[in-house]
């Protein structure tokens, strides 16, 4: 009926208390540093959990989440566990120490200026591109090795033959053949919207659905 309201309750058995070990900051394809909260392993809904999303830098800073903090976490289905409540804050928030960073104008996130100059950023962006295209066996580890072998851009990897792929450490003929086959298959099947979204060259506010809508409305967008 029109007056009905759908809502989901969090049951007590899907909530646990955990101790924070620290915060890992992952560099996104847009140069933002996103927090992952590492915790002492706990059982939650029959699964051992050792980390949870930290949402954003403001959440970490405002709640002083760092080593020793006590938090309540929950998990629903296959969704990444998240923090419900901070029971005991740390002495100080665990903000990034290994990179120079700045706050965004909104004061919610932090980002790395000139992230394009950082190898970690380039590997993340390349990995994301192939993940969006559905290339299953091109992990960040593989991309890292290809990068070190001089295949340090998306075009270079797409164009690389078997011999070139095998110049990467640990990439033997069978692995190279699998990578080459999967990339060829993905490129032949992908849509323009997938390429645009996966490239990471556009605003982070533009998602896959928005790109699909743009390409549908403007099928010749690349030649305009």
Where are the regions a protein language model picked out?
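RNA/tRNA-interacting regions in translation and RNA-turnover enzymes
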Residues: 1-196, 205, 213-214, 220-223
């Amino acid at each position: 009926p029109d007056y009905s309201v759908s809502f989901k309750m969090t049951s007590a058995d899907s909530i646990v208390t955990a101790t924070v070990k620290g915060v890992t900051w992952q560099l996104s394809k847009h140069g933002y540093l996103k927090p992952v909260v590492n915790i002492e392993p706990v059982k939650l809904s029959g699964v051992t959990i050792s980390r949870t999303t930290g949402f954003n830098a403001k959440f970490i800073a405002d709640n002083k989440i760092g080593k020793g903090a006590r938090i309540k976490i929950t998990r629903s289905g296959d969704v990444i566990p998240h923090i419900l409540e901070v029971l005991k804050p740390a002495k100080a928030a665990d903000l990034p120490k290994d990179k120079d960073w700045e706050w965004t104008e909104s004061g919610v996130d932090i980002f790395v200026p000139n992230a394009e100059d950082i190898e970690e950023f380039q590997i993340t962006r390349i990995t994301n591109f192939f993940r969006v295209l559905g290339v299953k066996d091109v992990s960040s580890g593989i991309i890292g090795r290809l990068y070190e072998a001089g295949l340090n851009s998306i075009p270079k990897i797409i164009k690389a033959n078997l011999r070139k792929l095998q110049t990467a450490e640990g990439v033997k003929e069978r692995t190279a053949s699998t990578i080459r086959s999967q990339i060829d298959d993905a490129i032949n099947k992908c849509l323009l919207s997938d390429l645009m979204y996966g490239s990471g060259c556009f605003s982070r506010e533009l998602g896959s659905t928005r790109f699909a809508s743009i390409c549908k409305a403007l099928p010749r967008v690349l030649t305009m």
